[in-house]
Amino acid sequence: MAAKDVKFGNDARVKMLKGVNVLADAVKVTLGPKGRNVVLDKAFGAPTITKDGVSVAREIELEDKFENMGAQMVKEVASKANDAAGDGTTTATVLAQAIVNEGLKAVAAGMNPMDLKRGIDKAVAAVVEELKSLSKPCETSKEIEQVGTISANSDSTVGKLIAQAMEKVGKEGVITVEDGTGLEDALDVVEGMQFDRGYLSPYFINKPEAGTVELENPYILLVDKKISNIREILPVLEAVAKAGKPLLIIAEDIEGEALATLVVNTMRGIVKVAAVKAPGFGDRRKAMLQDIAILTAGTVISEEIGMELEKATIEELGQAKRVVISKDNTTIIDGVGDEVQIKARVAQIRQQIEDSTSDYDKEKLQERVAKLAGGVAVIKVGAATEVEMKEKKDRVDDALHATRAAVEEGIIAGGGVALVRAASKVADVVKGDNEEQNVGIRLALRAMEAPLRQIVTNAGEEASVVARNVKDGNGNYGYNAATEQYGDMLEMGILDPTKVTRSALQFAASIAGLMITTECMVTDLPKEEKADLGAGMGGMGGMGGMM
């Protein structure tokens, strides 16, 4: 086991604080509408330019191990805020730095760290409740656009795109961000249920100019097994041909004679058929087939429950208004499924999301909810260079998370104003059990001005003057750093999602409280490099040349 270096008391805290400040100072320059960029060197390729707090935090490793421990703990604040709300990482870092700096001053003055921490916790709990009461629901498209704009660093085109996407696919829909091909941002909306399986044979194509298969008012046969014998599906084919409608077959696979017969029938115009593989694998495939069945009011023909494909009737087939199949995707538009059953299925999947511990599973389940409930929107980010593309995608991602958080828990005045208002409201109400807890409460409430002050500093203004003016105001009165004007923050469209501010404050206070109560730090001693004997011997070999 390696030897350890141990530091106690003030020595440990001074080192830790230095690390906290290095990381926080690098992150906080990005805060606000006039926040600056940070350039990150990469081992391969061009440097990354970003205004995303968590991206900056993740890059920082300090040489001194004690300082690095402080930096890593603040990095944890940014990561936690990012995981919880997807945004607010810089705000969380600024708050953590402010609470740690104020708290360690009090510890150095001889206060009891545990009482300080209890005071901080009381203040934070009271402010969180106050933020919830200040919060108003985010309902209109305009408000969603404003939240997106603020989070994307005042880029109104991003705000508009996100608002349009949410309008199209609903608040439950999946919105993804991809690299665009041009210079302009674009929004691509897929309505209905889409899954990533294309046609099994190009001979099914009936729209050659688009290279797709389009079926109007088709029947949909859902089968939970491979089909290789045409006899199995003959009864269904005959019934569908009699009804004069097209047929889409979704099965684990269709091969050999069965596929060849379907192609021949389609080419001769006897019956219009298309076949695709079922999406997903294993249990997920079964679940997705069931989703399609509920969406189209059909039944999955499965041998597991004693059903036979030869005995399938036309009543067991699903139906939809339209199906479009490309080389890679199948989209089912306007399935005739019962709304009540679809809602019940969505509720069931939501319960699975809550119970799941795997992020991957949660993401896949959320996709299923979106496909049943609304649709999928893709925001394609346009940029002139790859460096700009990365930076812009980061901002669009942040804005997307912020708007989701706003829809979930509502909105409050932005620009750090809500924290200042909440802090001043609870200042007279929250009381500790002793004077040292009261000091903890006061320092936590004072630290809540830090985001406002940092936004103003980044805009090149005098922080203490603006902070005093904002504190003298009431309600949503605050300072717009973008236009350098005072006014009602909600009317000016400067909004923050309540969830983002709340989680930033809670995570910052949690880690800061732990750092204030730190009394000892332990790290590995650096290993001494042993002299390389081989190198010395190599020099002697050179003597041979002198002879």
Curated annotation (Swiss-Prot):
Its EC number is 5.6.1.7. Its main location: cytoplasm. Pfam families: Cpn60_TCP1. The keyword Cytoplasm applies. Keywords: ATP-binding, Chaperone, Cytoplasm, Isomerase, Nucleotide-binding. One of its GO terms (biological process) is protein refolding. It is an enzyme of class 5 (isomerase). One of its GO terms (cellular component) is cytoplasm. It catalyses: ATP + H2O + a folded polypeptide = ADP + phosphate + an unfolded polypeptide. One of its GO terms (molecular function) is unfolded protein binding. ATP binds at residues 30-33, 51, 87-91, 415, 480-482, 496. It is found in: Cytoplasm. It comes from the Bacteria. Together with its co-chaperonin GroES, plays an essential role in assisting protein folding. The GroEL-GroES system forms a nano-cage that allows encapsulation of the non-native substrate proteins and provides a physical environment optimized to promote and accelerate protein folding. Belongs to the chaperonin (HSP60) family. PANTHER family: 60 KDA HEAT SHOCK PROTEIN, MITOCHONDRIAL. Forms a cylinder of 14 subunits composed of two heptameric rings stacked back-to-back. Interacts with the co-chaperonin GroES. This is Chaperonin GroEL. The lineage of its organism: Bacteria, Pseudomonadati, Pseudomonadota, Gammaproteobacteria, Pasteurellales.
